[in-house]
Swiss-Prot record:
Function summary: Could be involved in insertion of integral membrane proteins into the membrane.
GO cellular component assignments: plasma membrane
Name of this chain's protein: Putative membrane protein insertion efficiency factor
Family per record: Belongs to the UPF0161 family.
Pfam families membership: YidD
Subcellular location per the Swiss-Prot or TrEMBL entry: Cell inner membrane
Membrane topology field: Peripheral membrane protein
SMART domains: Haemolytic
């Protein structure tokens, strides 16, 4: 499913977007955001993030830089303490 969605986004970028011009008020563009979100988080969560982004893409939103959120690293190493500084 992830591959199909990525192909659909890429098809939009190559086949439709060039005829519409660069009108996106965000950086990265909504299609680039969708491609990255689906690639990073998979079909379900990536599509959810892309849909959230598309819902913000309207004339009354100021736009700006809106990157795909980074995955949080919930893995703790054995040398890390509760405060995170690594002391024993």
């Amino acid at each position: 499913m992830k591959t199909i969605l990525l192909l659909l986004v890429r098809a939009y970028q190559l086949g439709i977007s060039p005829f519409l011009g660069q009108n996106c008020r965000f950086y990265p563009s909504c299609s680039a955001y969708a491609f990255e979100a689906i690639g990073e988080y998979g079909a379900l969560k990536g599509s959810f993030l892309a849909t959230k982004r598309l819902c913000k893409c309207h004339p009354w939103h100021p736009g700006g830089v809106d990157p795909v959120p980074k995955k949080s690293s919930s893995k703790k190493t054995s040398s890390t303490t509760a405060c995170g500084c690594g002391h024993s």
